[in-house]
Regions:
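Membrane-embedded beta-barrel scaffold of Gram-negative outer-membrane proteins
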Residues: 1-13, 45-52, 56
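Transmembrane beta-barrel architecture of outer-membrane proteins
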Residues: 13-15, 25-29, 51-57, 139-144, ...
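Conserved small-residue
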Residues: 19-25, 29, 36-138, 178, ...
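Membrane-embedded beta-strand positions of outer-membrane beta-barrel proteins
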Residues: 33, 47-49, 159, 258-260
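Transmembrane beta-strands of outer-membrane beta-barrel pores
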Residues: 35-37, 51-57, 152-154, 163-167, ...
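Repeated loop/turn-to-beta-strand initiation elements of outer-membrane beta-barrel proteins
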Residues: 41, 154-159, 246-247
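Extracytoplasmic gating/loop element in the C-terminal half of outer-membrane beta-barrel translocons
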Residues: 164-257
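Conserved small/polar residues in nucleotide/adenosyl-binding loops
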Residues: 268-275
């Protein structure tokens, strides 16, 4: 793969030079099956399903692009992992009591109602070098689709379902639904989830306390923002009617079909009701 590294502005327009990036191994498979049948009554239908999966991993990583592809820049790098791996902190709930704050590892900005991060190396401090790890992969486990078609006499119906299973998605809506301190406070609307934020009167909440300051750096890449990207969507539904040839022939039309269709009709995701299809 090629990579375009940043360059000093004084170099001018000729400073943008592509360099060789990592080497990657890709493997995948797709299966598509179709079944068609016609009944004596004149009812015809077909069912087509497909499923696909792919895996990739970085096999070689030149030193000059090592810091671009995640890891801590030392021993922990992306080699042997998927290209779209996510590197960050492991969120461990929020501080709900002063005792939890006092007995936790050193963490700049910690306090009641703030996100707590795991001390992965056990040294009693939350640091960028030793307390980040590989926390997810945005690639789905597999994708699938289902196409249903049926017709009876002059009426036809078609439905197309499409879905994704697995894969971690960065839910940017959380920046507005759970926080007041990591977006523009004065000029940005926020979702009503902020009304359920932690407070001494609401001590069981898992949403960070409202604040106009971000001393705990809570916009950092962490598992707090990662959600399961699985979904199933009814992409298209179409109902049509083909006019009899005897009717349209008088108007010198060989074939006339009228139809109504709708797109993105139904969506199923779990546990969040948000549509993660646009986040991929």
């Amino acid at each position: 793969m090629l990579y375009l590294p940043p360059y000093i502005g004084a170099f001018g327009e000729g400073g943008d030079t592509y360099v060789n990036g990592p080497s990657m191994e890709n493997r995948g498979v797709e299966i598509l099956l179709t079944y068609r049948n016609s009944l004596p009554s004149g009812f015809n239908y077909s069912i087509t399903g497909n499923i696909a999966t792919f895996k990739n991993k970085i096999t070689e990583l030149p030193d000059n692009v090592r810091s671009v592809y995640g890891g801590n820049g030392m021993l922990d790098d992306i080699i042997g992992r998927p290209r779209n791996s996510i590197y960050g902190y492991v969120a461990d709930g929020i501080f709900k009591t002063q005792e939890e704050v006092d007995n936790s590892p050193q963490q700049a900005g910690k306090g009641l109602g703030r996100i707590r991060y795991k001390d992965l190396d056990g040294d009693g401090r939350i640091t960028q070098d030793y307390d980040r790890t590989w926390i997810g992969v945005s690639d789905p486990d597999f994708t699938y689709g289902l196409n249903l078609q049926a017709s009876y006499k002059n009426v036809d119906l078609a439905l197309f379902f499409q879905g994704v299973h697995g894969g971690d998605v960065w839910d940017s809506w959380i920046e507005y639904s759970d926080f007041w301190n990591i977006q523009n406070v004065n000029n940005t609307n926020h979702l009503k989830g902020v009304f359920n934020a932690w407070s001494p009167q609401n001590p069981d909440s898992n949403i960070p306390a409202l604040s106009t300051r971000n001393t705990n750096d809570e916009k950092r890449t962490s598992t707090y923002f990662l959600k399961d990207g699985s979904y199933l969507k009814l992409r298209t539904i179409e109902l049509g009617y083909t006019f009899p040839e005897s009717m349209v022939k008088k108007a010198m039309i060989s074939r006339l079909r009228a139809y109504v269709s709708a797109n993105n009709c139904l969506l199923y995701t779990s546990p969040s009701p948000r549509d993660y299809a646009a986040s991929r």
